[in-house]
Amino acid sequence: MLQEHNKGTRQYELPFGIGLAISAQDGLRAVKQCSSELDYLRRKEYGLTRNVVYRKRCVRGVYSEDADSRDSVTEVDSPLLGSRADILDLDNECKSISSPNSPVKAQSCEPITLQVSKPFPTADLSNVMFGVATTLSRLQDSIPQFSHWLSGTGALFLAIVVDDSVTDDDLDALESMYEAHNISLTTIRPWNCSFDVNEQHFAILHDLIDYSTHETQWIAIIDDDTFFPSPYSISQLLASHNASEPTYIGGLSESQGAVAFFGHMAYGGAGVFMSMPLVEQLDSHVEDCLAQSITRQGDGLLNDCIRNYTQTELIAIPGLHQLDMRGDLSGFYESGTFPLSLHHWKSWHQAPVDKMAKIANYCGDCFLQRWKFGGDSILANGYSISVYQDGITQAELDLMEGTWEEAMGYEATMGKMREKAGEGKKKSYRLIDAEEVDGSLRQIFVLHGASDMDLDGEQEAMDEVVELWWDWPRGD
């Protein structure tokens, strides 16, 4: 398989798992493997340049009841990135070009200790049934994200698969894939195939009633790109409300324009939660609501039906995020907020949410928590490392950075903002991967495209990589 590796260089996977080769002026030549601690840098999906600037920092997480509140930014005197950086040749055993006589010792790095909260308890969502309407392929593609928050929770998951050509074997295979991830998925076809996928998000109410059990207290309707960083936080949210009364919980859009146009309602991408008494009230009115409502959006149909046939009012939860913003959402993710839900992460903006939130498995409330190092660097845990050329003050950090399109128009819903950092004022390393390695967590942050001169004096791109290696005291 051919892949781009660097300007003027193409990399090939050799057959039978024997390694890699790259094209060169004298033909193909083999790529020498890196050490086991560094070989991950050559993964095809990372798309790194042949030569990279590499830094590693070891972080020791110490569980503490006194861990600083997320409302403030914890300050650390020492720099985050440290003084050591190596330029590695990924096509030549990941050898250091900058210090050829000093081999890179990937296992040793400058340590730093951070106080963090303990992991959240295991979530029990056995009283919740989640429902979605989407295509077979999107359900297949979304297994890593659904696994993060559904696996092992005991929740029921019902999916209307809207493809005309889907077969029983397709549905059985999909259920087996989810079962392998400890998710109880039931797939069904629409009871009315004339409805589009948006209408199916409301019509699914009938099915959710039919497939609920005596344990089911809550019904949740979501989009296929709704993501909950912490299932425990969702269980706590629901536990704080009365499931024996008609209850309607959700999040408004952050866009004033969307709320003005679509209305004051629970927006579906943020997650809509209803108690069983409310769903039972609506069940007999589904066909009438489909016939009467002007809107054809599932969340709008649901809201109109609730307003027309019940006395239940919306309980709006700020942490449930529709994220109706386009472009660069780094300002949101770097603001220190702990989101209950995220949306549009693979369409209106791009964020590897399942990899980002992996840190929450180790220190719960520390996901997207901020630490300030040496006056100029901010770690937004799980998302980015930002280095500010002129430093950054607490007053500036108290304001969300308006990085996305027309961001200043969101101040009414998201609070006062600061302007986006000017060109060259902020250097951002974004997380591209996170994985457990022998009980530790490795986070990989990348800054693409920094320039340098190659051996022939030509300017070439060179990516920068920061590896954070998290360890926790065993047995804590």
Give each language-model segment a name.
Residues 215-225, 306:
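Short beta-strand-to-loop acidic/aromatic patch adjacent to the donor-nucleotide binding site
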Residues 226-309, 313-324, 332-337:
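Conserved catalytic core of nucleotide-sugar-dependent glycosyltransferases
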Residues 161-218, 232:
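Active-site-proximal specificity loops/subdomain of glycosyltransferases
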Residues 122-125, 144-157:
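Short, acidic, metal-binding catalytic loop of nucleotide-sugar glycosyltransferases
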Residues 138-142, 193-202, 227-230, 267:
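Phosphate/oxyanion-binding active-site loops and adjacent basic polyanion-contact surfaces
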